[in-house]
Curated annotation (Swiss-Prot):
This is Thrombopoietin receptor. Residues 514-635 are cytoplasmic. Phosphorylated at Tyr-591 in response to THPO stimulation. Ubiquitination at Lys-553 and Lys-573 targets MPL for degradation by both the lysosomal and proteasomal pathways. The E3 ubiquitin-protein ligase CBL significantly contributes to this ubiquitination. Its main location: membrane. Expressed at a low level in a large number of cells of hematopoietic origin. Isoform 1 and isoform 2 are always found to be coexpressed. Homodimer. Interacts with ATXN2L. Interacts with JAK2 and TYK2; these interactions increase MPL localization to the cell membrane. Interacts with THPO. Interacts with SHIP/INPP5D. Interacts with BTK. Interacts with SYK; this interaction negatively regulates THPO-mediated ERK1/2 signaling. One of its GO terms (biological process) is monocyte homeostasis. Residues 205-232 are annotated as: Disordered. It comes from the Eukaryota. Residues 172-281, 392-486 form the Fibronectin type-III domain. The lineage of its organism: Eukaryota, Metazoa, Chordata, Craniata, Vertebrata. It is a single-pass type I membrane protein. Disulfide bonds join 40-50, 77-93, 193-323, 194-241, 291-301, 334-352. The chain crosses the membrane at residues 492-513.
């Protein structure tokens, strides 16, 4: 190219109007709520950009944007144009000098058609109320101190106004299968969780500003939305934020944007930052991580060892603050314990230990490296050393009081925390796999246990601290104590003795009642043992009743004879003229006992019918079983 041609091109470029500002479609959408045709915004409150749209293109120099503060002459703002597809032309003006941008003063702006000498549109605004901040930059995200926590820090493009901005965080799990972008799961809205980053010229903001409670985004469950739909947000007022409730071991994406706080400065939400991804460490509970101390000086941590993988433990101490001062803690190696059987087999647990103190919080991190070389991180819950005191295994002693009734005693492993120690006792029958667990009261040193007689059991005991001063994990179970309960002979002897005592007491009570209260004794005796009736009196009454109900004539039958006998009357001799009495006295008569079966049909006539009234025989035998023997004598 000739030198003169290069000179002309350079001159044309220098003389051409500069494209002073560019307004993106995203900026236009953020200002959609502004109904003014002439729209303005400020990124840092030290600049000002205004624009408007025209449907028809116009020659260069047709329009002019003028501005003026009160009692000042109008000045023109240099314009640049942008072609808008299917719409027209967009005219943009950016104030050239920072001194022309003043806060808290009304600014009068109007658009003038130079050729027609007409005002196209006009507006009065305050620069401090049209803020549209740029998205935060240098966003850093990492796992927090708790499993499922995410710690985010960022820097503001304009640090001078960062104290007058509030921030919004949007995040969600990263889905590698979705090539169009991550699906927004949930957004949280709350107040600040940590204050702004501490700068060299500022005061200790970490100690001055309070911290809000961490949010729980997954408390109500995830809610899937479309990629274009915005959900709720997490609001913060500083350069760091700590959120919780995420799923440990998952990957997340996040974005940030800012807005004037509405108190000192006003405006609209700015655009979202570029997405940042972060991998959260897994929960060390999956490895069975357990840390404890026996002497409040040395801490031992153990976790399950995985096959074909190596692991390493790390720790660091932090002060008790709501917002962490150390954004990027320095992890120290936890000294690994030597294996007792190297090369024989993979141990079940990996162990490491380190020295600690009781003036800071302990954080534990375990890194597991698999055979392909992939590193997986697992984070444990932070703890104080007095919350991880592990007691030695207690000793269990027992003795059988009676059949199936045991008295248990155990020796307290720590006399300095006897009232803060709780126990668990479990037992099972021989040949059974199910354990029954009992929890004695806090601080108990013994108890009783009732088991089935003539059975065999296994008993175990363990202890842990659970008081206001010390806490810790459960100790290991004691060695199984085998118990064989006795038979129920003692119970039978007890019942027999009880019956004897009750019987003797009853006899003594009756004797005492007879001696002290005879009348009550007689009533009690008649109530318990009624007297037998008089048999003679009862029989006599029975005979009288039977005679009254018997017929006047009775028949006597003698089954021993074939011919029925007849009643004979023995008359005296004719020489004896003296009449004999019809019935003599009982003392002068002989009686012959007859069989009752022979008297069934025999008619008896003790008193003849010719006898006078009142001369009936006095020897009336009611049962008709006897007859006078003299009546049967031969004449």
């Amino acid at each position: 190219m000739p030198s003169w041609a290069l000179f002309m091109v350079t001159s044309c470029l220098l003389l051409a109007p500069q494209n002073l500002a560019q307004v993106s479609s995203q900026d236009v959408s953020l200002l959609a709520s502004d109904s003014e045709p002439l729209k303005c915004f400020s990124r840092t409150f030290e600049d000002l950009t205004c624009f408007w749209d025209e449907e028809e293109a116009a020659p260069s120099g047709t329009y002019q944007l003028l501005y003026a503060y009160p009692r000042e002459k109008p000045r023109a703002c240099p314009l640049s144009s942008q072609s808008m597809p299917h719409f027209g032309t967009r005219y943009v003006c950016q104030f050239p000098d920072q001194e022309e941008v003043r806060l808290f003063f009304p600014l009068h702006l109007w658009v003038k058609n130079v050729f027609l000498n007409q005002t196209r549109t006009q507006r009065v605004l305050f620069v401090d109320s049209v803020g549209l901040p740029a998205p935060p930059s240098i966003i850093k995200a990492m796992g927090g101190s708790q499993p499922g926590e995410l710690q985010i820090s960022w820097e503001e493009p304009a640090p001078e106004i960062s104290d007058f901005l509030r921030y919004e965080l949007r995040y969600g799990p990263r889905d590698p299968k979705n090539s169009t972008g991550p699906t927004v799961i949930q957004l949280i809205a709350t107040e600040t969780c940590c204050p702004a980053l501490q700068r060299p010229h500022s005061a200790s903001a970490l100690d001055q500003s309070p911290c809000a409670q961490p949010t729980m985004p997954w408390q109500d469950g995830p809610k899937q939305t479309s990629p274009s739909r915005e959900a709720s947000a997490l609001t913060a007022e500083g350069g760091s934020c700590l959120i919780s409730g995420l799923q440990p071991g998952n990957s997340y994406w996040l974005q940030l944007r800012s807005e004037p706080d509405g108190i000192s400065l006003g405006g609209s939400w700015g655009s979202w930052s570029l997405p940042v991804t972060v991998d959260l460490p897994g929960d060390a509970v999956a490895l069975g991580l357990q840390c404890f101390t026996l002497d409040l000086k040395n801490v031992t941590c153990q976790w399950q060892q995985q096959d074909h993988a190596s692991s390493q433990g790390f720790f660091y101490h932090s002060r008790a603050r709501c917002c962490p001062r150390d954004r990027y803690p320095i992890w120290e190696n936890c000294e690994e314990e030597e294996k007792t059987n190297p090369g024989l087999q993979t141990p079940q647990f990996s162990r490491c230990h380190f020295k600690s103190r009781n003036d800071s919080i302990i954080h534990i991190l375990v890194e597991v490296t698999t055979a392909p070389g992939t590193v997986h991180s697992y984070l444990g819950s932070p703890f104080w050393i007095h919350q991880a005191v592990r007691l030695p295994t207690p000793n269990l002693h027992w003795r059988e009081i009676s059949s199936g009734h045991l008295e248990l005693e155990w020796q307290h492993p720590s006399s300095w925390a006897a009232q803060e120690t709780c126990y668990q006792l479990r037992y099972t029958g021989e040949g059974h796999q199910d354990w029954k667990v009992l929890e004695p009261p806090l601080g108990a040193r013994g108890g009783t246990l009732e088991l089935r007689p003539r059975s065999r059991y296994r008993l175990q005991l363990r202890a842990r601290l659970n008081g206001p001063t010390y806490q810790g994990p459960w100790s290991s179970w004691s060695d199984p104590t085998r118990v064989e309960t006795a038979t129920e002979t003692a119970w039978i002897s007890l019942v027999t003795a009880l019956h004897l005592v009750l019987g003797l007491s009853a006899v003594l009570g009756l004797l005492l009642l007879r001696w002290q209260f005879p009348a009550h004794y007689r009533r009690l005796r008649h109530a318990l043992w009624p007297s037998l009736p008089d048999l003679h009196r009862v029989l006599g009454q029975y005979l009288r009743d039977t005679a009254a109900l018997s017929p006047p004539k009775a028949t006597v039958s003698d089954t021993c004879e074939e011919v029925e006998p007849s009643l004979l009357e023995i008359l005296p001799k004719s020489s004896e003229r003296t009449p004999l009495p019809l019935c003599s006295s009982q003392a002068q008569m002989d009686y012959r006992r007859l069989q009752p079966s022979c008297l069934g049909t025999m008619p008896l006539s003790v008193c003849p019918p010719m006898a006078e009234s009142g001369s009936c025989c006095t020897t009336h035998i009611a049962n008709h079983s006897y007859l006078p023997l003299s009546y049967w004598q031969q004449p």
